Curated annotation (Swiss-Prot):
Keywords: ATP-binding, Cytoplasm, DNA damage, DNA recombination, DNA repair, DNA-binding, Nucleotide-binding, SOS response. This is Protein RecA. One of its GO terms (biological process) is DNA repair. Belongs to the RecA family. It comes from the Bacteria. HAMAP family: RecA (MF_00268). The gene is recA. ATP binds at G65, P66, E67, S68, S69, G70, K71, T72.
């Protein structure tokens, strides 16, 4: 760039900063804009799948899935992890269904958690906006979008038609919220439910409530599903859960994480440490025996999990090593699903020979 253009650009940038404030325009390579702070989800495998070690601050996140799939449990684990870092968290309970006893069991400090149970969708989103603009709240959960009932619908008759009212409400609210959330560096998580579209012949009939606005404004979208039951004898004690990163603006998307959620306990961190440790050769497995640093640590996965529960120092060491390995980008990439054109050509030639 020649000197005249550089001077003109510098003058324009100076004028913009003077008129609109410092930071209103900057170069993308500036370190302040590049680094994204993340809050752990409480699941190591999900943190790795998200690519940055957790959910991004200053962004909108959507978590959706069928009933009893673990949506609220996952958000409560995020609150517990955020509170460990000294962050202030708020829970906007539009469903009026939050159980404080269950939240406490998952590690949430219920004494410090801000909770609101609003009457209307407008009230819920206005409270959310005021909390964000205060710059004092770090994590806000809205549970759920489907329960954000517009005031007109509440005041109207039961059979009245209110086409697109909730979608318009969400669209307007997100236009206001997005910039404020970024400026406050606040993590805002919307929990959403699934509905079925009628008459869909091809593709998935599933859709989320509240229109399309949230799909666009969300930086991360997580699809959480229950894929199996965990049993002790005949008694079901938990769920096998799979989370798919459907959208990710801060790292490569479409990665998956699988973990166990035990009733009354939450996400099994110890089980993840064992599985990921074996997968990435930090823990050696010979038959039913597991070894760490050359020493046997237990026979059977359940015994190793019990050891990690009791020995917090060893568990923290294994987790730190796994995070360093998996989030540094040194893990060898898996072979892509789509084959090269040369490979496909070679295979077709072999078939014809």
């Amino acid at each position: 760039m020649d000197q005249n253009k550089q001077k003109a650009l510098a003058a324009a940038l100076g004028q913009i900063e003077k008129q609109f404030g410092k930071g209103s325009i900057m170069r993308l390579g500036d370190s302040k804009t590049m680094d994204i702070e993340a809050i752990s989800t409480g699941s190591l495998s999900l943190d790795v799948a998200l690519g940055i070690g957790g959910l991004p601050c200053g962004r909108i996140v959507e978590i959706y899935g069928p009933e009893s799939s673990g949506k609220t449990t996952l958000t409560l684990q995020v609150i517990a992890e955020a509170q460990k870092k000294g962050k202030v968290c708020a829970f906007i309970d539009a469903e009026h269904a939050l159980d404080p006893i269950y939240a406490a069991k998952l590690g949430v400090n219920v004494d410090d958690l801000l909770i609101s149970q609003p009457d209307t969708g407008e009230q819920a989103l206005e409270i959310c906006d005021m909390l964000v603009r205060s710059n004092a709240v770090d994590v806000i959960i809205v549970d759920s979008v489907a329960a954000l009932t517009p005031k007109a619908e509440i005041e109207g008759e039961m059979g009245d038609s209110h086409v697109g009212l909730q979608a318009r409400l969400m669209s307007q609210a997100l236009r206001k919220l997005t910039a404020n959330i970024k400026n406050a560096n606040c993590l805002c998580i919307f929990i959403n439910q699934i509905r079925m579209k009628i008459g869909v012949m091809f593709g998935s009939p599933e859709t989320t409530t509240g229109g399309n606005a949230l799909k666009f404004y969300a930086s991360v979208r997580l699809d959480i599903r229950r894929i199996g039951a965990i049993k002790e004898g005949d008694e079901v004690v938990g769920n096998e859960t799979r989370v798919k990163v459907v959208k990710n603006k801060v790292a490569p998307p479409f990665k998956q994480a699988e973990f166990q959620i035990f009733y009354g306990v939450g996400i099994s961190k110890e089980g993840e440490l064992v599985d990921l440790g074996v997968k990435h050769k930090l823990i050696d497995k010979a038959g039913a025996w597991y070894s760490y640093n050359g020493e046997k640590i237990g026979q059977g996965k359940a015994n190793v999990m019990k050891l990690f529960t009791e020995n917090k120092v060893m568990a923290a060491e294994v987790e730190a090593r796994l995070r360093e390995l998996l989030l540094s980008g040194d893990v060898p990439a898996e072979k892509p699903v789509v084959a090269d054109a040369d490979e496909l050509e070679a295979e077709s030639e072999q078939e014809f020979e």
